[in-house]
Amino acid sequence: MDRYFFLQDASTVAKLLLGNLLIRKIDKKEIVVRIVETEAYMGITDSACHSYSGKRTNRTNAMYNIGGYSYVYIIYGMHHMFNIVTADKNNPQAVLIRSVEPVSPLLGEKCVLTNGPGKLTKFLNIDLAFNKVDLIGNNELFLQRGLNLDFNIVCSKRININYAQEDDINKLWRFYIEGNKFVSRC
């Protein structure tokens, strides 16, 4: 996937990421997962977004990069959230990767838990070291076009954003592959 792909707005990229592959290399081993659920955060006009009203902090600085960079942060003091920055530099939008479906064979894994944003980062060993990483040309964490992009997309309200304004709470900016068993539960 090239830079141009990520220069679109977050709601467009969030839909287009579905079915594509996220690849994590750990100790010469590749873990391949298929993105099955995303949420769009539309920047300074979206009260659910960390960069709402142009808020810029050490944590949100990653969102001000050009599209294609990662934005990783911690919630509840223990769960890492993996986002992909979209749009132009200084237009702080991002897509939260909410759930993924394992594709590569996993040696020694009996039960894979990737149906939630905190679970998938734990599974893929994504932590703050992956904040502000350019995902284009990176060797440890990168995206690749999926082979099967024939599916229905469900649009719904985003999850756990009760702090946002009502208009933003009601936006249908959560996207997932219909019928996929790895989609997170609300």
From Swiss-Prot:
The question of whether DNA-binding is a record keyword is answered with no
- In the record, what lineage is assigned to the organism producing the protein? Bacteria, Pseudomonadati, Spirochaetota, Spirochaetia, Spirochaetales
**To which protein family does this belong?**
Belongs to the DNA glycosylase MPG family.
The name on file for this protein is Putative 3-methyladenine DNA glycosylase
One Gene Ontology MF term: DNA binding
**Could you say which enzyme class this protein belongs to?**
hydrolase
- Which Pfam families does this one have? Pur_DNA_glyco (PF02245)
Record-listed E.C. numbers: 3.2.2.-
